[in-house]
């Protein structure tokens, strides 16, 4: 089991390639069978083995073991199987030790170990040992590195997001760790030079936008749907419009500014434009649409003017490609819906002119 964990971990000191595929597949299937049938004595023996190999700085002499350890945790503690308090404490020390290495691979490996701990440990153990705070403070330092790969960026922010569930005194009204993350994410998106990284960061901004909602799982499912289908977009739009977006109130102006700054990337390739625009659409649905216009109207005229102009420029640059035209039309429909949905209230005077303008654009695009 220990050997298979080292061989199948990626990357490892053995550089075990993914071909022939039958070999790696057989190894993984065998490993899954033996890890799920582990009993107490086997677990104790494995724990003792890793304790000897990965104690303090000794992990640097056992590179295979440290990669194998992360693989073992992922396979051994899955589903309803939770880590013991002893394994939780040991995994924390291993994660902290490997992250002292300057190599980004080991910082990412440490974040992976932390994420496995946060997902597969007893919440009571995590909170009593204050594990989540230690991990958050350690990993948040990586959030300032804007040159990471998409994989490393995803590992960092996934780990930080998992920490939030264990802060029992956190609420949506007071400034909290969620706000610190949004501050850094918005900053990183604005200075990101790669579309793929921007898309990755935007997804986490969107997730934080509905973190405090009671129907978080429902919103997760709706946002994961294919929103190019009108009926699914309608369900998603209605659900997002009813969100209680107290956190987004504080960030609405900066999120709108971020979307305008990012819109320049929409003029790149058709594929990049489509993916980024769809992610912007989800972000707008969650973070901006639920906010009452009376609280938002001071920021919207500038956003409408600049952002819609870029959307129209996209159509010209990409020669009205259907994969670009569809999300552009959807965005314009959402902006129009936002204005029309305030019909029960008096529409702010500085927004009244945009209602007819957006309707005209929608009709023009439909031709």
Residue ranges and their predicted role:
Residues 1-5, 39-51, 84-93, 127-137, ...:
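Core helices of alpha-solenoid repeat scaffolds
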Residues 2-26, 34, 99, 103-169:
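Helix-rich alpha-solenoid scaffolding regions
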Residues 2-77:
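Extended alpha-helical scaffold segments
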Residues 14-22, 52-63, 94-109, 140-155, ...:
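Short coil/turn segments at helix-helix junctions and helix-capping linkers
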Residues 21-30, 57-76, 91, 107-120, ...:
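HEAT-repeat alpha-solenoid elements in large eukaryotic scaffold proteins
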Residues 28, 96, 117-124, 140, ...:
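Eukaryote-specific, cytoplasm-facing alpha-helical/coiled-coil scaffolding segments in long proteins
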Residues 37, 75-79, 119-123, 162-169, ...:
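Alpha-solenoid helical repeat scaffolds
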Residues 332-367:
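Eukaryotic acidic, Ser/Thr-rich intrinsically disordered low-complexity regions
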